[in-house]
């Protein structure tokens, strides 16, 4: 049936071309449907008739009713829809019969005419000019009721956008998030910068990178897993307040919260610490919610998230003890006991974990999903935070926070480690833990996803001022502000396996 409909559409296209119709390329719509609807929704039929308001619109036809010598079409654009009224006697001889009647759902039309309201009060355009701008050769899905197959929605996002206005609003909100972040950052005197997407050494996070090859230089390069080390080089160079919004890439698993290509915002502020950055993060998110949602509350799933109150703060160990009454503080200082706890929780551990990694596993398994209201978790173990400054109070933890909302991580920040010697030791320790290698000269034998960035150490040796940093996942933030459960629903074209 679909093949027959496509065949009919091609026959109509051939007929239109054969009879000398040229598809215009110079039609310029002056009005959009949403603005027209908002502006004239309260006008009466008599008011519109007397005003004789002329408009010019374009969009995709999504419905039609042909009634002899007149027709009603529904046109849709990104933000709304409007009805067209076409009468045969207003157009050239045979134009209505030969062409207008052969137009199909999905065709893109341009129209000019006067606004009026039908007897039922529907705002419409009485057309004095109408043109077929593009002929759709394939029919719209399910007679324009939308796509039901989830995979098809992701693979053919253009069809999903055509048939799903809610989806359009999600991506409009995503765009507003970018706009309002930049608005806030510029107001706070931050400079937006760009750092390399392809790097000689993929640093700033522990993740497996995508590898590419530069033919002229004959070297392997890596799509960045994080911009962090380059941004901190800029702080060394004298830029005190910077941010970047851009893509990062990690050659790892795909889930409802992870896409290999994702959008991050990173912020760095000299002469500040992680407490300052927590305060900054809190104010930024409060601003975004107010600007985008219109109030201080956000619905996500069954949860109502309140952004009006000051965000709750507690340490990693305090959070574990709060949600695990059977665990004692002394247990979290004993690797043997923590290994037993991890095993009891059913956590699949493929390699030996150190104390910091064990604590993090327990937290991820038992606490993270319970953090519904905005919560800063503080003081992470030094073993899982190689770029963070050690705490002045407890050298086993670092001045780091992660922000959790509605059960998942939204942001990560810390006081930056600016001790070059300590950073060098941490880099080497990270390599040793991953590969059981003690000799720096064997760096060529390391897996290519963990390498030692000697130039970054050199930069630190020139002096990094006391600095705090922040990373926010824009995709997850969009999920939160649009009430979506999957990261794929807030990315236009998520990564998928090729279809068979």
From Swiss-Prot:
Q: Which GO terms describe its cellular component?
A: cytosol
Residues holding Mg(2+) 1:
402, 409
EC no. given is 6.1.1.6
Cite a single GO MF annotation. lysine-tRNA ligase activity
InterPro entries referenced in this protein's UniProt entry, alphabetically = Aa-tRNA-synt_II, aa-tRNA-synth_II, aa-tRNA-synth_II/BPL/LPL, Lys-tRNA-ligase_II, Lys-tRNA-ligase_II_N, Lys-tRNA-synth_II_C, NA-bd_OB-fold, NA-bd_OB_tRNA
Question: Which cofactor does this sequence's record say it needs?
Answer: Mg(2+)
Task: Supply the alphabetized keyword list.
Answer: Aminoacyl-tRNA synthetase, ATP-binding, Cytoplasm, Ligase, Magnesium, Metal-binding, Nucleotide-binding, Protein biosynthesis
Q: Which reaction is this enzyme known to catalyze?
A: tRNA(Lys) + L-lysine + ATP = L-lysyl-tRNA(Lys) + AMP + diphosphate
Q: Which residues bind Mg(2+) 2?
A: 409
Q: Name one Pfam family in it.
A: tRNA_anti-codon
**Gene Ontology BP terms:** lysyl-tRNA aminoacylation
Entry's localization field: Cytoplasm
Q: How does it assemble?
A: Homodimer.
Q: Give the protein's recorded name.
A: Lysine--tRNA ligase
């Amino acid at each position: 049936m679909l093949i027959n409909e496509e065949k009919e559409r091609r026959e109509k296209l051939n007929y239109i071309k054969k009879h000398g119709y040229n598809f215009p390329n110079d039609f310029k719509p002056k009005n959009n449907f949403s603005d027209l609807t908002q502006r004239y929704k309260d006008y009466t039929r008599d008011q519109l008739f007397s005003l004789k308001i002329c408009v010019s619109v374009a969009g995709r036809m999504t419905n039609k009713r042909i009634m002899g010598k007149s027709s009603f079409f529904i046109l849709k654009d990104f933000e709304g829809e409007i009805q067209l009224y076409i009468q045969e006697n207003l157009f050239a001889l045979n134009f209505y019969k030969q062409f207008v009647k052969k137009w199909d759902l999905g065709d893109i039309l341009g129209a000019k005419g006067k606004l009026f309201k039908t007897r039922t009060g529907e705002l419409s355009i009485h057309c004095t000019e109408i043109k077929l701008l593009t002929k759709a050769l394939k029919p719209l899905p399910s007679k324009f009721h939308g796509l039901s197959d989830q995979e098809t929605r992701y693979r053919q996002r253009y069809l999903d956008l055509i048939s799903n206005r809610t989806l359009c609003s999600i991506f409009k909100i995503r765009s507003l998030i970018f706009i309002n972040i930049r608005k806030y950052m510029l107001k706070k005197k931050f400079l937006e910068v760009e750092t390399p997407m392809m790097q000689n050494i993929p640093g700033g996070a522990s993740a497996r990178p995508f590898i590419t090859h530069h033919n002229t230089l004959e070297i392997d390069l890596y799509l960045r897993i994080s911009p962090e080390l380059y941004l901190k080089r800029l702080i060394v160079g004298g830029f005190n307040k910077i941010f970047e919004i851009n893509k990062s890439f990690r050659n790892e698993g795909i889930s409802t919260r992870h896409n290999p290509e994702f959008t991050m915002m990173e912020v760095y502020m000299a002469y500040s610490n992680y407490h300052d950055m927590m305060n900054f993060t809190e104010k930024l998110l409060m601003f975004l919610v107010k600007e985008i949602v219109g109030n201080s509350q956000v619905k996500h799933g069954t949860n109502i998230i309140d952004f009006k109150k000051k965000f709750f703060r507690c340490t990693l160990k305090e959070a574990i003890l709060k949600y695990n009454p059977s665990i004692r503080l002394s247990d979290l200082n004993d690797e043997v006991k923590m290994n037993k706890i991890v095993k009891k929780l059913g956590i699949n551990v493929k390699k030996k974990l150190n104390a910091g990694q064990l604590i993090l596993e327990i937290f991820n398994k038992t606490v993270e999903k319970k953090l519904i209201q905005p919560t800063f978790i503080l003081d992470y173990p030094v073993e899982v935070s190689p770029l963070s400054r050690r705490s002045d109070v407890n050298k086993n933890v670092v001045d780091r926070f992660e922000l959790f909302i509605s059960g998942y991580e939204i942001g990560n920040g810390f006081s930056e480690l600016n001790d070059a010697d300590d950073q060098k030791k941490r880099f080497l320790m990270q390599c040793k833990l991953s590969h059981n290698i003690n000799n720096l000269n064997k760096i060529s034998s390391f897996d290519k996803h963990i390498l030692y960035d000697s130039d970054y150490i050199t930069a630190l040796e020139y002096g990094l001022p006391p600095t705090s940093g922040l990373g926010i996942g824009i995709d997850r933030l969009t999920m939160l502000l649009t009430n979506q459960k999957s990261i794929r629903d807030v990315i236009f074209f998520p990564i998928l396996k090729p279809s068979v």
